[in-house]
């Protein structure tokens, strides 16, 4: 697992570039030390891969077009494919550290158009209303997933059969998330989360909204 302190983008885009991501095994594990990022936050971005995460310590806030979610230590969740998001470190008392599995769903689904993809993968990744599936302690079903998720980061890439064991664990977690997301999947979403132009426009709005707000307040104070 690689410690990361920054984010890279494809040229001219806010799509995240994932160093070390290979087609023959489309997966990377990361340990994000958010306090070492510039400004203690990860700016607006997206990626085709899904982002399965667990909070090792501290707490972070996830922002998406749909709103904000706070994740303290011991919580976790999954960010859906192509969802615009940003994160920022919140805790000032302990290190803000996030563990991440970032993978293309083909790792679980196999060949494009497979039965597994159609039945269990596509219903989640094509649902625009599902931006994040949060997992918090205190809910029995979510705690079961969190326990398995935390354990999954203890798998060693040096052990025999690592790739198969990892895929098996991620598949088990995905099935549990699939069941948990049933109420979310039954709701209808309207926006197209895969439209890059819309993402860029939304990033501009989010990044400049605060500037406009401060400017208006400044004007009021001097009029």
Task: Indicate where each model-derived feature is located.
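Amphipathic, well-ordered alpha-helical segments in soluble domains
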Residues: 51-54, 117, 141-148, 169, ...
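Short, Lys/Arg-enriched, Trp-marked, Pro/Gly-tolerant hinge/linker segments that flank
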Residues: 131-142, 155-217, 221-222
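Aromatic/histidine-rich interaction motifs
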Residues: 115-146
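Generic protein-terminus/edge-of-domain signal
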Residues: 1-76, 82-83, 118, 129
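Short histidine-centered beta-strand/loop micro-motifs
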Residues: 40-46, 63, 88-90, 111-113, ...
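Detector for the N-terminal beta1/A-loop initiation region of ABC nucleotide-binding domains
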Residues: 61, 86, 208
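Ligand-binding loop in jelly-roll beta-barrel domains
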Residues: 82-106, 113-116
């Amino acid at each position: 697992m690689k410690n990361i302190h920054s984010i890279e983008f494809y040229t001219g885009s806010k799509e995240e570039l994932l160093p070390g991501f290979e087609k023959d095994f489309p997966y990377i594990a990361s340990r994000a030390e958010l306090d070492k990022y510039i400004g203690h936050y990860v700016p607006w971005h997206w990626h085709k891969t899904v982002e399965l995460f667990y909070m090792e310590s501290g707490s972070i806030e996830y922002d998406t077009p749909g709103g904000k979610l706070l994740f303290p230590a011991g919580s976790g969740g999954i960010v859906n494919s192509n969802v615009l998001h940003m994160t920022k470190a919140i805790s000032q008392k302990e290190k803000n550290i996030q563990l991440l599995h970032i993978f293309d769903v083909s790792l679980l689904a196999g060949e494009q158009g497979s039965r597994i993809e159609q039945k269990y993968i596509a219903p989640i990744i094509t649902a625009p209303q599902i931006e994040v599936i949060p997992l918090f302690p205190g809910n029995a079903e979510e705690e079961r997933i969190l326990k398995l998720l935390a354990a999954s980061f203890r798998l060693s890439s040096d052990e025999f059969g690592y790739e198969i064991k990892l895929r098996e664990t991620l598949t088990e977690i995905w099935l549990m998330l699939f069941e948990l997301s049933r109420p979310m999947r039954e709701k209808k979403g309207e926006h197209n989360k895969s439209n890059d132009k819309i993402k860029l426009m939304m990033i501009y709005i989010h990044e400049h909204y605060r500037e406009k707000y401060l400017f208006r307040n400044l004007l009021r104070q001097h009029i």
